[in-house]
Amino acid sequence: MTHSHAQLVWQDGQPMSAVFGDVYFSRASGLEETRHVFLRHNQLEERFAALPPSGSFAIAETGFGTGLNFLCAWQCFEARAPAGARLHFVSAEKFPLTPSDLAQALALWPELEPWSSQLLAQYDVLTPGWHRFVLAGGRVTLTLMIGDVLEVLPQLDARVDAWFLDGFAPSKNPDMWQQALFEQMARLSGPGASFATFTSAGAVRRGLAGAGFEVRKAPGHGAKRHISHGWIATPPDAGWQAPWYARPEPRWRERSAIVVGGGLAGAASARSLALRGWQVTLIERMPQLASAASGNPQGVLYTKLSPHLTPLTRLVLSGYAYSLRALRCLLPEDGDWQACGVLQLAHDGKEAEKQQALAELNLPESVMRPLDRDAASELAGTDLPCGGLFFPQGGWVHPPALVRQLADHPNIVIKTGRTALTLDYDPAQRSWTAGDEQGPLAVASVVVLAGAAETAQFDSTRHLPLKKIRGQITSIPASEESSRLRTVLCGEGYISPARGGRHCLGATFKFDTDDLGVNDGEHAENLAMLAELAPSLRASLDRDAPEHLDGRAAFRCTSPDYLPLVGPAVAARDFVHAYRELARDATLRPATACPWAEGLYVNAAHGSRGLITAPLSGEILASLLEGEPAPLPADLMRAVHPSRFLLRDLIRRKLDPDAL
C-alpha cells in the first residue's frame, strides 16, 4: 500500500519522467497530438454528438500522467455532446504527479484552464486506492485508480466505449505493455468499443489483435510516422461470474427513485441520483432531515486506519478523499465545517505500535504525518501527553448542514414527518409504492433504503443483520484555554475545537438498549475519556456541572463485519432456494441468475464512519443503476454487498429458510 508520486525532471519547462526517461507528451505540441491520436482516432466528436439527451459515454485510459488526455476529452464532450449527456473517464496511474507538479504541467495550456482549474481544485487529496471526482456539476466523472494498471484493471467493473492506450513508450516501460493488459481491455470493452494509441510497435499491434481487436495503422502527428487504432472485433468469453455479485440488469422505465431515510446515507444517495437526472422523493419520518445519528452538532472526518490492507481501511481511504472533495464543493468553510486537521494520539503502547506501522505506509505528508509530543502540543494549541498521527486535511463538520446541502437539488422532493410503513412492488408497471397510514407517499421505479437499522423493517430486508449501538455525545462550554484548541483530538473518543462557544466530545458505545435519553452517567464517561486523552484540556473545562452540559443520543447502525451494506437487495427465500447446493459444496459454480428484489437497493450500516463512507456509497448505487464504471475495485464492491451475509450463512448452514 506504499504510495509514490512521480519523480519529474523539467526540461525547457516541460515534464519528463526521471524513472522512465521519457516525456509525458510531445515536446512539439502535446495538445495537438492528444487530439489527433486519442480524440480523432476514437471518433469522439462524432460519437459525442450522436449521444441521446440522457446518454453516457465511458472512456478508459492506461496512464493518467498530466491529465492532458482527460481534459481534452472533457473539452470536446462539452462542445459536442447534448446538454443532458454524461462523460465517465476512468484512468490508471502508478505514479501520480504531486498537486504542484500537475499545476505546473497544466499551466502550459492556458486554453484548458476552464477545465484544468476544476480538476486542480479537487486533486490535492491523493491517498492510495481509487478516487472519484465529480466535475462540471455532476456531468463529468473521473475515476482515478492509483496503482499499477495490470493490477487495477482486473478489479474494474465497467463497460468501456473508447480506450486511450497511453503510457511511456514500450521500449521505456515494457512492464505495462503486456498481453494481460490487452486482454483486460477486451474484457472491459462494450459493443463497438474503440481504441487509439500513439505507438505502432509490432508487439503492441499483435497483442491487441490476439486479444480480439481489429488493428489499423494511421499517420502519426508531427515527427511520429504511424499510430495505431481500431475496435473490438471478437469480444472474449466472459466466463463464469458469481451471479450474486453481478449487476442487476436495469429494468426501470423512468429515472425515478424513492429514498427512505433523511440522514447522510439517504441524502447522499438522493444527490448522486439527482445529478444523473433522476427524480427523487426523499422520505424522512422525523420533522426535519438529519434528526438521528446525522444530527450531532459536530462530526469528525476521522480516518482510523489499519496498517494492513483490510477492506475497511481501503474503503475509508477512498471515502475520506471523496467526502473532503464533496465538502469543499458543497459547504463554505465557516461555521459548518473546518479543515482544522485531526490528531490521532498514540495514547497507549498498542496504539503507538500501530501508528509506527501506519507511518511505514509512506502516505504523502499532505495526507498523514507523525508528530512527537512537543510538535503535537504546539500544533493543537494545548499541552498533550503524547504525540500521534496528524491528518492535515481532516477536520470537523456540522452534519445537518451537509445533509441539507446534499438534499438541496431541484430533482429532489423532500417529505418529512412521514414514515414509509409499506413498500409494494407492481411487476406489471415495474414500480414501487411507498405508503404510510394515510395512504401512498410516492411511486417510483427504484427504492433505496437508507434508514439505518430501520432498513430491516420491511419484508424484503428482514434478513439483513443490522444492529444498533447507542452513542451519547457531550456538549460543554469552552474555556479561555480550551478555545485555543486548533485541531480535532482523537483517541478512545474525540473532542473538536469549539463551535458556537461549545466543544463536542464523545461518544459512548452502549449495546442492547433502545433508550435514547441523555444521562449524566455517559456525560461522566465522555469527560473521563477526555481526561485520559488530554488531561490539561480537561482540567481547563471548569463549567462541567450537569446544568452546564448538553448532549444528545442516537443509534449508530452497523453490521457484523463493520462494513456498510451498499447495493442491490435480493429476494431472500428465492436466493436460498436458488443456491441451496452451496451448503453442500461451496466450490460449485451455479449458473442460475440471482433472484433480485427488483429495483430495491440498500445504503446502510455506516456505523460511526458515516461522514467517510456514506457520500461515496451514494455514488456506488448511482453507478450500479446507471450502468456506469464502479467507483471502487470489485473486491471492495463485494465486501459491501448486501447479500454477503446471506451467502455466508447459506454456505455455513446457518440459515433457517422458514425464518426468512
From Swiss-Prot:
Main location: cytoplasm
Keywords per UniProt: Cytoplasm, FAD, Flavoprotein, Methyltransferase, Multifunctional enzyme, Oxidoreductase, S-adenosyl-L-methionine, Transferase, tRNA processing
Cofactor: FAD
EC numbers for this chain: 2.1.1.61, 1.5.-.-
Statement: the UniProt record of this protein carries the keyword GTP-binding: no
Keyword Oxidoreductase: yes
Chain positions covered by the region annotation FAD-dependent cmnm(5)s(2)U34 oxidoreductase: 260-660
GO biological process, one term: methylation
The organism's place on the tree of life at top rank: Bacteria
A Gene Ontology term for the protein's cellular component: cytoplasm
Gene3D superfamilies per UniProt: D-Amino Acid Oxidase, subunit A, domain 2, FAD/NAD(P)-binding domain, Vaccinia Virus protein VP39
Catalytic activity: 5-aminomethyl-2-thiouridine(34) in tRNA + S-adenosyl-L-methionine = 5-methylaminomethyl-2-thiouridine(34) in tRNA + S-adenosyl-L-homocysteine + H(+)
Molecular function in Gene Ontology: flavin adenine dinucleotide binding; oxidoreductase activity, acting on the CH-NH group of donors; tRNA (5-methylaminomethyl-2-thiouridylate)(34)-methyltransferase activity
UniProt-annotated stretches for the region tRNA (mnm(5)s(2)U34)-methyltransferase: 1-233
Family per record: In the N-terminal section; belongs to the methyltransferase superfamily. tRNA (mnm(5)s(2)U34)-methyltransferase family. In the C-terminal section; belongs to the DAO family.
Entry-linked HAMAP family: MnmC
Known role: Catalyzes the last two steps in the biosynthesis of 5-methylaminomethyl-2-thiouridine (mnm(5)s(2)U) at the wobble position (U34) in tRNA. Catalyzes the FAD-dependent demodification of cmnm(5)s(2)U34 to nm(5)s(2)U34, followed by the transfer of a methyl group from S-adenosyl-L-methionine to nm(5)s(2)U34, to form mnm(5)s(2)U34.
Name the record gives this protein: tRNA 5-methylaminomethyl-2-thiouridine biosynthesis bifunctional protein MnmC
Native species: Chromobacterium violaceum (strain ATCC 12472 / DSM 30191 / JCM 1249 / CCUG 213 / NBRC 12614 / NCIMB 9131 / NCTC 9757 / MK)
Name of encoding gene: mnmC
